[in-house]
């Protein structure tokens, strides 16, 4: 290909380009030759590309074949002879109407004038080689056979010709630009780096005698996770070179890579077509479509789609081959790809206007450094004032207690021997006693749940109770180090080394015995209790860290039992011994004799009684909550669903959680799970994913009593009250408060769940849906009452009591998961929301990360089938619901941008449940948008 120079323009005579239409360049063999309708002249088709830099590239010059197309082509419905190309170029031959209009203005005046005379006849045709060849062959066969059969074939071909013509005219500049982002064989992440250097490095790693084998091609080009697709790509590229090879050298690999990495959409489309068209006949049959669907499903880990490949292949053929010729061509594949967005009109992303965004993000304009710093400070104070005042009060109390003990012991005789080491140790001990008492309050769950419902929740951040618990634990560690460090390294040595005079004058009345040795001090009640407490604290604090609690530390057997939730749970019960030792340690003090000076028990009395009372309440309350299992289901992804009867006295809010115990698994362990049923349901349901020892054993116990699913029901195994085997007994305790229960405070909700993290929000969606239905029923009842009151006379009856109007106007639910089977967990809820939410209050977005991002060639056909099936049947092929499934991960910055644009000046509650990494990202994004826009995002993360 070379640029199309000005001198070349004089050789061709083009038709004009009308607004909004794509024209086909046709030329006679000599300049200035007039066009003849009866086909006396020989025509050629010239295909050119107009690049973004206004350069013109000549793509091909092909002879054109005239055919007679009957239809509504001309105003008088008569046949018109039109030049149709026989393409020999592997690329597509289309350009946008706007670019042709620019080009036509640059042509010589006489050429433009001649072209305009024929624009009405020529502007609707632009045929490719495959159609012309197929049409000629089929038409000849039909003419030879004669009769009605040949006429039917001709009619089918002519009908397809008209569809092709319309499809090519519809390929506007905007659709072509969108297409450039599609059918990528190399992901965007790889494009951001020097991909060829990586390929060369891989070539050097896998090459043998200067060649890499077909089996290593996938790893070489970075497609190791979709090896089957890479092998088909290798074969397609080899067929383009008329070869069938098992190995290629470095130069051939570069050639393959250049084709794969080609920026031209037409080139990528041709490669994709060649992958499907294995017999190279220019046609794709239903069997070939089925094979590529199975290949794409395998590459994207969609096992169910693979099983339904035949059904979806028939769907594609039905859409693209209405003439039932038994095959589709390249242009039809392109049409489906370019027009898929017209099918994807369900669960669309939020509406977005740049004007609204510019109004909402006024703060994005540049500010001075001082102004920016002051704005940041004001924002931090506004967003975190609850945390700031609570932490400030806590720190001030600790400082006050430390200074109180510091100066108190400075007046004692022992100070003359041990100095400031004693003062520091005693100050740290006082803060230690205070924090050992305070650390119990954040885990008094019943108390916290009750306080959430009081006005105190406006001033105290109860959502941060677990974080505050951890912060206090950190302060305890510091106090322990200071206290025991000063005693062992400073105070005890000074007592041992004190002169006889100093000991008798300043210390004898404390010990009432001869001067002790270092060992005497350590083996005394104070020393023994202190050392034991430190050992138990080290064990408990270590196993409570994130690395051990979440099994991030891999230990060899049998030490692997020291990691995981069970180790954390049981080791925390060592604090029962710690608190007993702490009280004993406070009784046997060296330097405090009167009972009222020994204040340890005073600090601990109330919190220990409160926490002990809560644990006792759990024991008796769990026994009073008599529940029986109604349904059990085990879904793909190792998720166990338990539906149980709802005790009369068990009242909860959406977003709350409860503790569950199964005596058949462990008579001691209680585990928290979000409630997935709505408060108005007559049952309680929870969803449990197998993540640890306890959940694994729980699933095993219930699997033994479950039965295979009946046809049409989801879930691998099921059980209910009719099951022959008796179901295991369950005990429940709760409900307990969680951040998500405050969703009613916000006008707009953004609910984000990762995997099983969707569970807190399912109850919220159900509750919202129930309220929506009630509001509609209430509106209908008022309407009926108004109509009836018009006909009533002298009635003094009251109008129906006005129910509380739902404050939430919009809810956006984003569910991100790795496995297709996960959508079975809440399929019923999603379908119910899609069916009953006529007002569009709830907008759901499912994201499947195992599928390659939209635009990747490996997921292109999946996207096409997804769009077609939903347009026809109203069901998403991936989730099996009416909610569209997006591929890869959401762009959270775009999500928040569109929300801030659509809901200016709104207060949006962002509720998240999932891994901490994304939680930090969302929290940071919320902070960024809050500083720069009028929309305020309030971030909440679930903690258990």
From Swiss-Prot:
The entry's comment on post-translational modification says:
Not glycosylated. Phosphorylated by CIPK26.
Renumbered residue ranges of the record's region EF-hand-like 2:
241-252
Expression (tissue specificity): Expressed in roots, stems, seedlings, inflorescences, leaves and guard cells.
Q: Which Pfam families match?
A: FAD_binding_8, Ferric_reduct, NAD_binding_6, NADPH_Ox
Residues that coordinate or bind Ca(2+) 2: 321, 327
So what family is this one in?
Belongs to the RBOH (TC 5.B.1.3) family.
**Under which name does UniProt file this protein?**
Respiratory burst oxidase homolog protein F
Q: Which organism is this entry from?
A: Arabidopsis thaliana
